[in-house]
Regions:
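Charged, flexible cofactor/metal-binding loops and thiol motifs
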Residues: 137-226
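Conserved ABC ATPase signature
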Residues: 48-53, 57
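A short, proline-enriched helix->beta-strand linker immediately N-terminal to the Walker B motif
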Residues: 68-72
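P-loop NTP-binding/switch modules centered on Walker-like glycine-rich loops
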Residues: 75, 79, 83, 87-167
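Interfacial catalytic loop of ABC nucleotide-binding domains
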Residues: 44-49, 167
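ABC-type ATPase nucleotide-binding domains, specifically the catalytic core motifs of the NBD
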Residues: 5-25, 35, 39-40, 135
Length: 226
């Protein structure tokens, strides 16, 4: 949100640009959308500036703005970053409800695996700008049927309540390479404990190894790895 313009002027601008509504109709639509996303006293909020709203309230305004023109696809890039756990839960519930009520598809871009597990139907894991694994979310989180070593590393690095005391988390070694100095072959090979000479020389393609499950790896089956 632009800090020098009121919430209303920014929300109405989007409606006027993308619909044939006049200013009065756009104002009414803005009030309707703020009500839909759970903002109390919507007409008063439209006259306020972003700094006068809480972080969670500003997030709701952004969602209202994104949905005001009835899009078929909502792209949510880190929608819960910097929000406390309570507000995060409210925002996720709101987006889930809107998805069901409006039939809007949501593309989540996030590093929060908990959000993915809760919200997604399908998940695409990316590394160095490439999709390295794509599968139904239940395969990754529910059945532990993940196949790519990077996905494995992400999941192993999450603290678990049932982990015995004294067991250290299995962090992924190394660091993500600079985008202007990417390694030859598989981009994850320098950090992969299963990498072979083939991985370091050749770049794997994204292949479907099971129905609905794609992976970019020469050794997608765990039994094939050293």
């Amino acid at each position: 949100l632009n800090p020098v313009f009121t919430v209303g002027s920014q929300l109405i601008e989007a409606i006027l640009l993308h619909t044939d509504k006049n200013k009065k109709e756009a104002w009414a639509r803005a009030v309707e959308m703020l009500t839909l996303v759970g903002v109390n006293e919507p007409e008063s909020r439209l006259k306020q500036y972003p700094h006068e709203l809480s972080g969670g309230m500003r997030q709701r305004v952004m969602i209202a703005m994104a949905l005001a023109c009835n899009p078929r696809l909502l792209i949510a890039d880190e929608p819960t970053t910097a929000l406390d756990v309570t507000i995060q839960a409210q925002i996720l519930k709101l987006m889930n409800d809107l998805k069901k009520e409006k039939g809007t598809s949501i593309l989540f871009i996030t590093h929060d695996l908990g959000v993915i597990n809760e919200m997604a139907d399908d998940v695409a894991v990316m590394y160095c700008g490439q999709v390295v694994e794509k599968a139904p979310v239940r395969s990754i989180f529910g059945d532990n049927s993940y196949l790519h070593p990077y996905t494995e590393g992400l999941l192993y690095s999450i603290p678990r309540l049932d982990t015995p005391t004294g067991i250290r988390l299995e962090a992924i070694p190394g660091a993500v390479p600079h985008p202007l100095d990417l390694p030859k072959g598989c981009k994850f090979a320098p950090r992969c404990k299963y990498a072979t000479d083939k991985c370091r020389e050749m770049e794997p393609e994204l292949n479907e190894v099971e129905p609905g499950h794609m992976v970019r790896c020469f050794y997608p089956k765990k039994g094939e790895r050293n």
